[in-house]
Amino acid sequence: MDEETRRAVAAADEALPDSDALPGAIDAGRVVFGFDGYLDRVREVVADRIDPESHERLATLEGFGDRIDRSVAADSSLSFEWLQQGSRTGGHTSHLARAFGGWSFDPVMVGMYGDPVHDAFEAEFGEYDLHSLGDPGVTDAVEFDDGKLMLTEIGDTMSLDWAELDAAFGHDRLAGKLDGASLLGTGYWSETPDLPTIFDGLRDLWGDIDDPPETVLVDPGDVRKLDGDRLRAGRKAIGRLDEVTDVVVSSNRAETGVLANAYAGEAERSFTDDAEAVYDALEPTWFVGHGVERSVVVSPDGTDSVAVPAVSNPELTTSSGDHFNAGLGLALIAGLPPAAAVVVGNAVAGYFVRTADQPSLTDVRAFVDDYLEKF
């Protein structure tokens, strides 16, 4: 185990409250999440149908791609059978509200939940402070052992901007929800192309809020969907928002590479170099890149890289990035330093992919306690 990871885990171990002090040792107040909303259908692809009751699963995304390549080479059409293994609410607001609600926070959800609110959101989040701006997206999440394929109908988040947010919810009303909150989480730029206009609007609004959140957590999402011109045009909005509050941007390994190429030019770079290039371009307080093998955080204190405990047979990988962000947000509220915060993000995501379930605060603490033993 590398010394950098050992130091990060030691810092997390020292800064995170002990299990017997949880949850009371963390100030679990209001948290606000916007501005998406999805209905996720978790699916698997059939490789071979044995009989009406049994089949073999197509296990890898590579194998899925090979079948497509062979079909293209043969100039032939192709069909797949897929099966739905479950369904749930999804997106940034749902996943983070679910996690923070389980940790005894008071989530405020402002996003796309339907009009009237769809039964799935009402059943799960009806006791939360939930406000719908429009229709949710629908995602078919196909799970493979080596990755996942997400097929998405975006919903009304695609057309959301600062003016539309005012019309659908109200800027003054949003300011009231943010007053006294400990965190604002936003996602995803990839599904809300005009999200930078909301960042600029928040910057102007911030001074009118008596007690605004100390941190805004930004998840850009799968920015491969956005062209380079849009990425470059929107980047300064994050730096402008960071002038009035701490902005923490969190992307996965692939997304970090796309952002680095857009801002620093196409090049072969390491994960760390990509993260540093994005930090220099966006000018947030922290930039965090999370990956399967390592997670990286760039801050005014420098760059830290933390190894991630691998899992050979994950129960569920869809939304692992959102769970990383939930852990990161928890660490930000608890005041952890950058490397330690990344350890907590890895812990929440690591628990989730191993169990397909939400960790309690005690579970998070236990994962940190055993972090080095999981390698």
Where are these regions (language model features)?
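Short, conserved phosphate/pyrophosphate- and ester-handling motifs at nucleotide-, phospho-/glycolipid
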Residues: 100, 252, 321
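Short glycine/serine/threonine-rich phosphate/pyrophosphate-binding segments
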Residues: 91-95, 325
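Glycine/charged-rich beta-loop-alpha catalytic/anionic-binding loops adjacent to active sites
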Residues: 73-84, 301-313
